[in-house]
């Protein structure tokens, strides 16, 4: 990864670490943090709110970013592998790592978004998380915008990431 990250730094390119299977989550988080500590590049990581560990994972990234003075982007998503994670865990006799009800995933998403918003860096030299919401859920987007206003951050402190062609009316309303 070093050559890629050094080239990204040289060209001012953000490298986003994606989050896939639960089994690789801790390895992905650790690799992300170690790479960020070794090389100063524009860094981002996807984090999944459908994981029961979502709140702890958010706290881990926030604490690390503050302690190291590192600014990183978190692309907060609900998660896309619910069926796989559920079936795989049940087949192996393991606890299921994802929330079983959508309302629990939604609640975790909103808690994580609040935590990341509260850790938004206020200066260039301060560590913290810049939040990018990967969601088409109007309630979750509205809750994040309301939290921004509550803590006195401008709307520009939040990036909304939506799939092209999905929910164009919501996209328009959220951008206003």
Range-by-range predicted roles:
Residues 1-176:
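Positively charged, amphipathic and often flexible ligand-engagement surfaces
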């Amino acid at each position: 990864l070093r050559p890629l990250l050094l080239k990204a730094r040289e060209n001012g390119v953000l490298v986003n670490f994606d989050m896939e299977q639960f089994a690789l989550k801790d390895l992905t988080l650790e690799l992300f943090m170690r790479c960020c500590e070794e090389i100063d590049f524009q860094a981002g990581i996807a984090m999944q709110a459908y994981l029961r560990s979502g709140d702890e994972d958010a706290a881990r990234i926030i604490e690390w970013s503050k302690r190291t003075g590192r600014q990183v982007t978190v692309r907060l998503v609900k998660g896309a592998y619910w069926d796989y994670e559920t079936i795989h865990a049940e087949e192996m006799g393991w606890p299921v790592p994802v929330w079983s009800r959508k309302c629990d995933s939604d609640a975790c998403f909103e808690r994580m978004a609040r935590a990341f918003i509260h850790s938004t860096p206020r200066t260039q030299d301060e560590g913290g998380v810049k939040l990018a919401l990967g969601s088409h859920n109007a309630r979750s987007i509205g809750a994040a915008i309301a939290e921004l206003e509550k803590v006195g951050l401008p709307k520009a402190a939040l990036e909304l990431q939506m799939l092209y062609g999905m929910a164009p009316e919501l996209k328009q309303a959220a951008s206003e």
